[in-house]
From Swiss-Prot:
In the cytoplasm, prematurely activated/folded SspB forms a stable non-covalent complex with SspC. InterPro entries: Cystatin_sf (IPR046350), Papain-like_cys_pep_sf (IPR038765), Pept_his_AS (IPR025660), Peptidase_C47 (IPR008750), Staphopain_pro (IPR028076), Staphopain_pro_sf (IPR037155). The gene is sspB. This is Staphopain B. The record marks E219, D220 as: Cleavage. Residues 37-219 form a propeptide. It comes from Staphylococcus aureus (strain N315). It is an enzyme of class 3 (hydrolase). GO terms for cellular component: extracellular region.
């Protein structure tokens, strides 16, 4: 083989290698550009501060995957790869914020749940953010609404008032979750505006789809779940005060394995003389809850406080329904939801910790939270104290 032939072969190989290098660099650049474009199209949520207490971070990172897996099992959904987005806050229009932190839970690229960390018991309400004990809860609260706009290159502020929850974007306020109130309307647009004070204070942003390094040891073991065998969500409370009616109907349908009960019929039975127009304003008193249960062949009794995990476990195994009686911590006498009723669906053990599963009639999905927490942080941004239970449905 002469030297000129060797030279030609060397040149050809050199050209091929340079071409491959150019192609790979181009692909790398395109990949980086695609990643940059994808990152630039991510939603940002406005917050006053992006600082989160370390104990909140650790608790969220340790628990979110197990909670998500347990809630997926309740809806017969396939489990997947769970990730935790950045925590955001919710504000009133005047700038007040609540004492909870909200984490988007991401599964296979979609925001599917919201992990809420809020004060564990009434005593914690008066403690600083760093000193209070936190309860962990998971639900689908505004998760779908966030998922729909997660890839939008925009900034929103999450707001709340007595009518529900809103997203504010470019000065426009949109209702995303309405409060169940007699006469309430699910208006899409609101004339409300963010206060100038709050606008000035919103100096930071968080990204709901940004996954941070998990510094805490993540645990996702669901060792045990026990629920009322035939429990189904068939209806949802909105423009009325029938929380106990919805809860009793759901529990009786479950324990009797039927679908004949509904909130309207129960309230009509309790208030036979009231017009249809006025019926949405009627609420239910403890003696009515007991008497209605007895009329359906159930021996109902009132028990003060939160039932123990062991009691819930046994009653659920025995196909006995428990209704939660809760009272708003704010104690506002003009509050149409000063009292609230919910249905206990069962219990679970996640990462060796005891949890309760319940249904809030305002929601279309179940919620899971710590069994030793007497505070319920419910759908429209208020804390309720679980003060008693009606047992026997």
């Amino acid at each position: 083989m002469n030297s000129s032939y060797k030279s030609r072969v060397f040149n050809i190989i050199s050209i091929i290698m340079v071409s491959m290098l150019i192609l790979s660099l181009g692909a790398f650049a395109n990949n980086n550009k695609a990643k940059a474009d994808s990152h630039s199209k991510q939603l940002e949520i406005n917050v006053k501060s992006d600082k989160v207490p370390q104990k909140v971070k650790d608790l969220a990172q340790q628990q979110f995957a197990g909670y998500a897996k347990a809630l997926d099992k309740q809806s017969n959904a396939k489990t997947g790869k769970y990730e935790l987005g950045e925590a955001f806050k919710i504000y009133k229009f005047n700038g007040e914020e609540d004492n909870s932190y909200y984490y988007p839970v991401i599964k296979d690229g979609k925001i599917v749940y919201t992990l809420t960390l809020s004060p564990k018991n009434k005593d914690d309400l008066n403690k600083s953010k760093e000193d209070m004990n936190y309860s962990v809860k998971i639900s689908n609260f505004i998760a779908k609404d966030l998922d729909q706009i997660k890839d939008k290159n925009s900034n929103i502020t999450v707001l709340t008032d007595e009518k529900g929850f809103y997203f504010e974007e470019d000065g426009k306020v949109r209702l995303v979750k309405a409060t169940p109130l007699p006469g309430n309307v699910k208006e899409k647009e609101s004339a409300k505006t963010v206060s100038a004070k709050l606008k000035q204070e919103l100096k930071n942003t968080v990204t709901p789809t940004k996954v941070e390094e998990n510094e805490a040891i993540q645990e996702d073991q669901v060792q045990y779940e026990n629920t009322l065998k035939n429990f189904k969500i068939r209806e949802q409370q909105f423009d009325n005060s029938w929380c106990a009616g919805f809860s009793m109907a759901a529990l009786l349908n479950a324990t009797k394995n039927t679908d004949t009960y509904n909130a309207h019929d129960i309230m009509r039975t309790l208030y036979p003389e009231v017009s249809e127009q006025d019926l949405p304003n009627c609420s239910t008193f403890p003696n009515q809850m007991i008497e209605y249960g007895k009329s359906q062949g159930r021996d109902i009794h009132y028990q003060e406080g939160v039932p123990s995990y062991e009691q819930v476990d046994q009653l659920t195994k025995d196909n006995v329904g428990i209704m939660i009686l809760a009272q708003s911590v704010s104690q506002n006498p003009n509050d149409p939801h000063l009292g609230h009723a919910l249905a206990v669906v069962g219990n679970a053990k996640i990462n060796d910790q005891e949890k309760l599963i319940y249904w809030n009639p305002w929601d279309t999905e179940l919620s899971i939270q710590d069994a030793d927490s007497s505070l319920l942080h419910l759908s429209f941004n208020r804390d309720y104290n679980w003060y008693g239970s009606m047992i026997g449905y």
